[in-house]
């Protein structure tokens, strides 16, 4: 922890550091710290820190600042469900949240990285590009995530979803760096991943004896919130930025007056990330026991009260993804997520199952990780997609499909993963919308891939069930160790939503240790309720 801050173009830029952290910044680990003596009487004036002095310039800008790539190839509707390969629900839940992170997904769909990637082996950005492209262009299907996504992390048992999330983001961050060239640590803070998820804390200590002020700046990638005494995310944020009194045994050793004196320490956000990851600290560090309590979180969150500069307008974030853990310990249970598609509809992503849900249901969960995006960023990327989804003549996809497919295959060797067979790559390159997809189903009812079934007796009269294709995506060639994990459909028992699904794909066993005996259909059912 502790990369220097950057001063570019008259504006401070603080980005993520090389070592991930979720805790409150500690001044002892920060490199940027400036103190100043009062210009007049110690009792009558306060001197601010000038952070512009002695900062190293950026030798190389690894990604354009301020403006992230936009892509018009992103479908507005929800994409594919993900196959559980045995205790991989934590991976699936994390990947779904990243897939629906607009700045990241649009960058992946633009294929900017893979067109210039020179790594001899697969990198995480190329692997994520293939996954996101495949997932977003496979509505109504269940796909199997590449094993490369969890390479070096998955050990065949339940893992913590937050740890895997940060593992993936950190791997993407490293993939942004040129592997064969030396890059200074200032330039590392200019990567695209930093620009999406990175921000910076300011820890300001004020000596109550000489009134000197010391500012320490500490980059962050996610924000951990203590919820022991908080009933809402706003209360947890207020506690986080509440001034801390340093006196008695915790008195401050002032570097200005050279005395051990009482002081106050105030933590604020100096710069806020485009995408904000809030982690609710539900698990103990030692035993892993879970704090199961309801913590309220809003659909729209104003972060301005927690910023260093208070003279600007509201800084509004909108919720777009929620990670949920069901269980009593981080060592067992089940992970699933809720995501907001480009169309504005919320969906529950539970491994292979993708179900329409309401915002009321989303806000009533015992959330573990919350994903917010700046409202301006959401609107900017949404407008780009809306402009790119112009009507196309039927069959237009067929005329340019070969060109797009060849372009995708030439991008990078990682995009030619075994599970990305010709049929799936062909699907991944099509630009589709939910309305267009429904229209195609009406025109091709004789095709076995999709069936729009009649309303079942157990569903509301205005519900629509879209059944899973008979094609088993990603399951054509099973690994030997996976063969023993296939379940017998006749022994499958499910409750609630699972009882309404009538697909034909078998799922893999062992989403978690605790739920190892509970089987799950590997079809992908889309339930639309008004």
Curated annotation (Swiss-Prot):
Which N-terminal residues, if any, form the signal peptide?
none
Q: Which residues form the active site?
A: 89 (nucleophile), 334 (proton acceptor)
> Can you tell me which residues the record assigns to a coiled coil?
none
Where would you find this protein in the cell? Nucleus; Endoplasmic reticulum
Give the span(s) annotated as Disordered.
382-412, 491-524
Q: Where is the composition biased (Basic residues)?
A: 511-524
**Catalysed reaction, written as an equation:** Thiol-dependent hydrolysis of ester, thioester, amide, peptide and isopeptide bonds formed by the C-terminal Gly of ubiquitin (a 76-residue protein attached to proteins as an intracellular targeting signal)
Could you give one GO CC term from the UniProt record?
Answer: nucleus
Indicate, by first and last residue, each region the UniProt record lists as having compositional bias (Polar residues).
498-510
Name of a matching Pfam family:
UCH
CDD domains per the record?
A: Peptidase_C19E (cd02661)
Q: Where is the USP domain?
A: 80-375
One of the protein's GO biological processes: apoptotic process
- Uppermost EC category: hydrolase
Keywords recorded for this protein, A-Z: Apoptosis, Endoplasmic reticulum, Hydrolase, Nucleus, Protease, Thiol protease, Ubl conjugation pathway
The job of this chain, per UniProt, is described as: Deubiquitinating enzyme that removes conjugated ubiquitin from specific proteins to regulate different cellular processes that may include cell proliferation, progression through the cell cycle, apoptosis, cell migration, and the cellular response to viral infection.
Task: Please report the name of this protein according to its UniProt entry.
Answer: Ubiquitin carboxyl-terminal hydrolase 17-like protein 3
Q: What is the lineage of its organism?
A: Eukaryota, Metazoa, Chordata, Craniata, Vertebrata
Q: Which gene encodes it?
A: USP17L3
């Amino acid at each position: 922890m502790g990369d220097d801050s950057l001063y570019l173009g008259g504006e401070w830029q603080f980005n993520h550091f090389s070592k991930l952290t979720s805790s409150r910044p500690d001044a002892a680990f920060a490199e940027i710290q400036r103190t100043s003596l009062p210009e007049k009487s110690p009792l009558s004036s306060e001197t601010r820190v000038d952070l512009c002095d002695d900062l190293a310039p950026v030798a190389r800008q690894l990604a354009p600042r301020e403006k992230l790539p936009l892509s018009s190839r992103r479908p507005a509707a929800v994409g594919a469900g993900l196959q559980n390969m045995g205790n991989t629900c934590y991976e699936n839940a994390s990947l779904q949240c990243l897939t629906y992170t607009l700045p990241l997904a649009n960058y992946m769909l633009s294929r900017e990285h893979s067109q210039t990637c020179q790594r001899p082996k697969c990198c995480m950005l190329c692997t994520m590009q293939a996954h996101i492209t495949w997932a977003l262009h496979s509505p109504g299907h269940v796909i199997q995530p590449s094993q490369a996504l969890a390479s070096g992390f998955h050990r065949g048992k339940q893992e913590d979803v937050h740890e895997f999330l940060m593992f993936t983001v950190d791997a993407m961050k490293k993939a942004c760096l040129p592997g064969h060239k030396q890059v200074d640590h200032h330039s590392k803070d200019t990567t695209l991943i930093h620009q999406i998820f990175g921000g910076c804390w300011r820890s300001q200590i004020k000596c109550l004896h000489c009134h000197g002020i010391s500012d320490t700046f500490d980059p962050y990638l996610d924000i951990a919130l203590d919820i022991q005494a908080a009933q809402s995310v706003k209360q947890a944020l207020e506690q986080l930025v509440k001034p801390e009194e340093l006196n008695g045994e915790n008195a401050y050793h002032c570097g200005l007056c050279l005395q051990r004196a009482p002081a106050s320490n105030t933590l604020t956000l100096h710069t806020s990330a485009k995408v904000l990851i809030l982690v609710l600290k539900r698990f103990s560090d030692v035993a892993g026991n879970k704090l199961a309590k309801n913590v309220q979180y809003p659909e729209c969150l104003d972060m301005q009260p927690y910023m260093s500069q208070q003279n600007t307008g509201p800084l509004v974030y909108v919720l777009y993804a929620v990670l949920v853990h069901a269980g009593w310990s981080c060592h067992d249970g089940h992970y699933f997520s809720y995501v907001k598609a480009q169309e504005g509809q919320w969906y529950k992503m539970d491994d292979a199952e993708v179900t329409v849900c309401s915002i009321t249901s989303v806000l009533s969960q015992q959330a573990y990780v919350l994903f917010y995006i700046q409202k301006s960023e959401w609107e900017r990327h949404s407008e780009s997609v809306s402009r790119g989804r112009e009507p196309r003549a039927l069959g237009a996809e067929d005329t340019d499909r070969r060109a797009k497919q060849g372009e995708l295959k030439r991008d990078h060797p990682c995009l030619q993963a075994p599970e990305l067979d010709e049929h799936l790559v062909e699907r991944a390159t099509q630009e589709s919308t939910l309305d267009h997809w429904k229209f195609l189903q009406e025109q091709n009812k004789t095709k076995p891939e999709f069936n729009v079934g009649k309303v079942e007796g157990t569903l509301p009269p205005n519900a629509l069930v879209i059944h899973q294709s008979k094609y088993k995506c990603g399951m054509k060639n099973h690994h030997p160790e996976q063969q023993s994990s296939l379940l017998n459909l006749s022994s499958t028992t499910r409750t609630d939503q699972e009882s309404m699904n009538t697909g034909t794909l078998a799922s893999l066993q062992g989403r978690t240790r605790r739920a190892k005996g509970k089987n799950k259909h590997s079809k992908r059912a889309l339930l639309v309720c008004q």
